[in-house]
């Protein structure tokens, strides 16, 4: 049971995250919330290639893109576009105010994608290897791509679209692919 917009968090969610938000990681008896913390924990505790660069400049870029993902991309893509689009019924989607707001967000997301596209020119956001910010950004791209107008936005960001294709082909991504309801 997770929270949905317009509804209070469930008691179950509040027991594991007092802020009532997802994601939450449960690993044995250990519970951790907040995406960046979860990603770092996964990197530190599970086998596989490191997801954090060791070189100081690359590590700083990683931290920059983690911040961008949390403070710009998540609000723009998820909070102000995907969630409203997902929960809007046909009547709401035809409402002029809603349409205006979604058009404004589309413009903002197109700008975000143009910035991301330049960053993804070398393959991944921090260069030629998959890192923690990619773990945070690509699921947002997944949800954007599932929304009306999302695939069209990605056309103007070919490097992001290519990274998204490669991300979806990763075993870890395929095993955790979120199912979207047929509503869309």
What name fits each language-model region?
Residues 37, 159, 172:
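Residue-level recognition of oxygen-bearing side chains
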Residues 71-168:
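GST-like fold's C-terminal all-alpha helical module
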Residues 43-47, 121, 169:
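Residues at helix-coil transition
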Residues 25, 38, 62, 116, ...:
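Residue-level signal for nonpolar/aromatic packing positions in well-ordered secondary structure
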Residues 176:
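Charged phosphate-binding loop/patch that engages nucleotide di/tri-phosphates or the phosphate backbone
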Residues 181-184:
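C-terminal helix/juxtamembrane-tail motif
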Residues 1-100:
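GST-like domain detector, emphasizing the conserved glutathione-binding G-site
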């Amino acid at each position: 049971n997770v929270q949905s917009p317009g509804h209070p968090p469930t008691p179950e969610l509040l027991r594991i995250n007092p802020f009532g938000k997802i994601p939450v990681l449960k690993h044995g008896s250990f519970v951790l919330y907040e995406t960046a913390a979860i990603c770092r924990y996964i990197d530190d505790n599970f086998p596989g290639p490191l997801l954090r660069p060791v070189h100081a400049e690359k590590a700083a870029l990683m931290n920059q893109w983690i911040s961008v993902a949390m403070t710009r991309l998540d609000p723009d893509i998820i909070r102000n576009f995907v969630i409203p689009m997902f929960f809007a019924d046909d009547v709401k989607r035809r409402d002029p105010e809603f349409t205006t707001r979604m058009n404004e967000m589309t413009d903002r997301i197109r700008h975000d994608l143009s910035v991301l596209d330049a960053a993804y020119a070398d393959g991944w956001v921090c260069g030629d290897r998959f890192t923690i910010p990619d773990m945070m950004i690509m699921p947002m791209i997944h949800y954007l791509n599932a929304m009306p107008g999302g695939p069209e936005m990605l056309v103007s960001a070919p490097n992001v679209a290519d990274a998204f294709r490669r991300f979806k082909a990763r075993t870890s991504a395929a095993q955790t692919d979120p199912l979207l309801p047929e509503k869309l």
